[in-house]
């Protein structure tokens, strides 16, 4: 899948731009470790929800840039399906991209929080847990935003002695497919907390009602959001909807 992550981040934190392209994306220098660029640190853990999605378990990763000063709040970006984004040798390579862009001062010092969707543990030995991904990501409303704001982010900040900004202009969300619509929903519901969104192939379709967003955007008062939408003409077209068309209508 295309991974124009460095372009997206620069667009969100630095400038506003509109682009349309059909090509095979190739990783550029921003996605490769560069000589002389200090590397941030990654830690991994497991979060068990006790409030918003009680009983669900999920892995998380936290990226802290080398330039982070604990006496100053950093910017914050939250990634859904975080395991894929957190891999330094994966498709997105967020730790590497952040290292390079922060070093060149093309984006502010930013902590990355990478969350996998929750899993409901099995009730019997030998069974697999049940994924809670679609319920968490595709549902409209503020439940997932509350999960972040009331449970995960305060808990992780306390546990790992981290400080990030309360300014919504310095806080973003990111995701792919159902994670993309989830990232948008968080900012849509709580623009007082998050105002930057990156959506890769966002599922603005009728999986759990997300097809209503283009109409809602037209009908509701304009919100102070900066959104990067990425999709391709060969993406899904099925009973839930047409992904490329849905993303065009969002714009």
Question: What spans do the regions from the language model cover?
Answer:
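Positively charged n-region of N-terminal signal peptides that target proteins for export
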Residues: 1-5
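Bacterial N-terminal signal peptides
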Residues: 6-17
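Non-catalytic cap/lid and distal C-terminal segments of serine-dependent acyl enzymes
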Residues: 21-251
């Amino acid at each position: 899948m295309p991974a124009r992550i460095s372009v997206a981040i620069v667009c969100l934190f630095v400038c506003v731009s509109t682009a349309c392209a059909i090509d095979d994306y190739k990783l550029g220098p921003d996605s490769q470790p560069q000589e002389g660029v200090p590397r941030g640190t990654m830690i991994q853990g497991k979060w068990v929800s006790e409030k918003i999605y009680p009983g669900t378990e999920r892995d998380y990763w936290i990226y802290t840039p080398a330039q982070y000063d604990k006496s100053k709040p950093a910017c914050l970006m939250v990634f859904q399906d975080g395991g894929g984004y957190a891999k330094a040798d994966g498709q997105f390579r967020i730790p590497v991209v952040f290292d390079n862009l922060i070093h060149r001062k093309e984006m502010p010092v930013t902590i990355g929080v990478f969350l996998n969707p929750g899993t409901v543990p099995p009730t019997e030995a030998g069974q697999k847990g049940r994924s809670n991904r679609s319920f968490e990501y595709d549902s409209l409303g503020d439940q997932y935003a509350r999960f972040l704001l009331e449970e995960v982010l305060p808990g992780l900040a306390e546990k790992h002695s981290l400080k990030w900004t309360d300014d919504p202009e310095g806080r973003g969300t990111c995701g792919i497919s159902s994670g993309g619509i989830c990232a948008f929903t968080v900012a849509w519901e709580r623009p007082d907390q998050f105002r930057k969104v990156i959506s890769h192939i966002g599922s603005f379709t009728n999986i759990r009602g997300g097809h209503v967003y283009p109409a809602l955007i037209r009908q509701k008062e304009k919100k102070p959001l900066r959104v990067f939408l990425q999709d391709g003409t060969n993406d899904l077209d099925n009973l839930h909807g047409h992904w490329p068309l849905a993303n065009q209508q969002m714009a």
